[in-house]
Amino acid sequence: ILKSYSGLGKNIECLAAAQAITELTFLLVGNNDKQQNYLSCVLAHLDRIYLYEESKEEDIKMLSMSIQSLIHLLAIGGINLPIHHCCKTGEPIIPPLGNWEWSCYYLPSEGFSSIEDPQSNLKINASEVALLQRLLFPELPIKSNGELLGPKKVWLKILFIIETWISAQLEKELSSLKMLREIYS
């Protein structure tokens, strides 16, 4: 045994986050399928979850770590959330931070559109799009004061996007994401 993650069950949040990684891995990687960098990404995210220290205050860091891990694994698995380009026009999506009039529309089977679409089931603002785009980076989006960017309601909105994207693209739902939603709602 090279690594053991026996402590992942220390709380329900960590367990659900680790289970989400496992469930998505089963869906994305076949038995003989060799995904470049997939295992190292899984291990890096499991390490992060394993090393997580729970705080006494309401903490959404585990939720954000789980969401980011799934975004990374979806990208490596070839079904990345297409958050950088409009699915209707192909134009880059560059959220104008501070412009509260600007919005983007999420379509679970296509991606994000800068053009309003009747099939869209979610409207997101510029700061939410920018946060979602930052989740592709290795580190969590942390403010200069050390706090996580975005309130809980935004992270739950991003969780909804991940849930519906996985469901639309892989035609399966992850039970662990329902668990995370229940824990943080």
Model segments located where?
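Non-catalytic alpha-helical scaffolds and adjoining flexible linkers that form interface surfaces
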Residues: 1-185
